[in-house]
A protein has these predicted regions:
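Short, small-residue-biased leader/transition segments that mark boundaries at the very start
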Residues: 1-2
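Conserved, mostly hydrophobic/aromatic
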Residues: 6, 50, 99, 142, ...
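Catalytic alpha/beta core domains of metabolic enzymes, predominantly
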Residues: 9-12, 17-167
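Hydrophobic alpha-helical bundle architecture
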Residues: 155-182, 186
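Terminal leader/tail segments of proteins
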Residues: 186-187, 193-197, 204-227
Length: 227
């Protein structure tokens, strides 16, 4: 089915609505959306997807929730003009994630001042975090602490890069110590727990192999290929 799209943006609201509401509020975005919907409906068009975007997370979320209370047209969700990558990822995860957990949102867009490919990766990660996407690896890792005896940050980054395009619906744990690591990650399909110059590979919380540190990553990736 081909959908027509209505895109309302807080930066380009009609002056009449800005005068009425004072600034681009959620109510102003929703009113603008319904005005455009009415124009399409008068022409017999009802297959429409609506987007109401703002660079302010609470406004975007409130607009989508208010719109959903009033009708059931499909909604495209996303925070616009999010800024640098770090800020943009946080804003997008907050806004899109909040709505997805409410059951709101039919299509999404992560807007970043970066390579558009990174927007796609971020969108997939948000869907996975919300429990709506099963494909792809879910990596869990612990914060570093006094028990960490390996380059945990470097190892996590290596695992992430190596599995970026893996579509297996598995959870991989990268833990900094063998004290709490296996227990904290027992729900993972497979993982690493580091020791002092060595580490172990575990599956479902059970140790399956003990190796020198430099062999951990290759061994982990080899086992993942066989899953």
């Amino acid at each position: 089915m081909l959908f027509r799209s209505i895109g309302v943006n807080g930066g380009s609201l009609d002056k009449r609505l800005l005068e009425k509401y004072g600034h681009p509020t959620a109510e102003a975005l929703v009113e603008s959306a319904f005005e455009h919907l009415e124009l399409l409906e008068k022409q017999g068009f009802y297959d429409t997807c609506v987007s109401m975007k703002s660079s302010t997370v609470p406004t975007m979320v409130a607009a989508a929730r208010l719109f959903r209370e009033k009708c059931d047209y499909p909604i495209h969700i996303g925070v616009t003009e999010t800024g640098p990558v770090k800020q943009g990822l946080i804003k997008s995860a907050m806004g899109i994630g909040a709505l997805l957990l409410d059951g709101i949102g039919d299509t999404i867009r992560v807007s970043l001042t970066d390579d558009p490919v990174q927007e796609v990766y971020a969108a997939k990660d948000i869907l996975k975090a919300a429990g709506l996407r099963k494909e792809g690896v879910n990596i869990i890792s612990c914060p570093t602490c006094g028990r960490t005896r390996i380059d945990l940050i470097g190892l996590v980054n290596q695992v992430d890069a190596a599995l970026k395009d893996c579509q297996k619906p598995i959870t991989v744990a990268v833990m900094g110590c063998i004290v709490n690591g296996p227990g904290e990650a027992r729900e993972a399909d497979i993982g690493i727990a580091g020791g002092d110059g060595w580490g172990m590979i575990f599956e479902k919380g059970e140790q399956v192999e003990k190796l020198p540190y430099e062999q951990l990553l290759p061994a982990l990736l080899s086992r993942i290929e066989k899953l």
